[in-house]
Amino acid sequence: MALALAWLGLILSAPLLRASGHEASAFVAYRVFAALCHQLPERSFYLDGQPLAVCARCFGIYAGFALGVVCYPLVRSLRRTDTPARRWLLLAALPTGIDFALGFTGLWANTHTSRALTGALLGAVAALYVVPGLIAFGLLIERRAQARAKILTTDFDKPFSKGGKMA
């Protein structure tokens, strides 16, 4: 959860850093997201007169994902490591794909709001697939640590014979 919120914070920090004259720090923040997003100013939300580090659609995806991670325990148990059927992820991606395709073909003039909302839906649903994987990974690490601890304590608990060798 902290990572998703920190990611969102970094997106929002770029324009604030630039607006407050911290160009070098802003440059780094924008650069981080340059590999992930086209960052077209005309397709981005603005904060303090500066574009966010990602476009409106990417911001929607990341904000939706962060919201999905925060709300995850309200929807599913943190003990579950299974994911929903893939069709739900594809269904959630459909509005984003339609919004993009209609805008690309000129049949629909998509807006920052349509991009952000369809992206947010996709991001929120994506959390239902990522969080269980992170939970499973955490459980795997925990089991391995417990197994190592058991091996170490078992080795030290064995009694020694009089000759200094293990019995």
Positions of predicted regions on the chain:
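Short, highly charged, low-complexity non-transmembrane loops/tails of multi-pass membrane proteins
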Residues: 139-167
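Membrane-interface loop-to-helix entry segments
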Residues: 51-67, 113-124
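Membrane interface segments of multi-pass transport proteins and intramembrane proteases
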Residues: 76-83, 107, 145
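Membrane-interface helix caps and helix-loop-helix hairpins in membrane proteins
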Residues: 51, 78, 104-114
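Membrane-interfacial alpha-helical segments at the cytosolic side of multi-pass membrane proteins
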Residues: 60-78, 125-135
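N-terminal signal-anchor transmembrane alpha helix
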Residues: 1-24
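Extracytosolic (periplasmic/ER-lumenal) interhelical loops and adjacent juxtamembrane/interface segments
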Residues: 16-54
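Small-polar-interrupted transmembrane alpha-helices in polytopic inner-membrane proteins
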Residues: 3-11, 68, 83-107
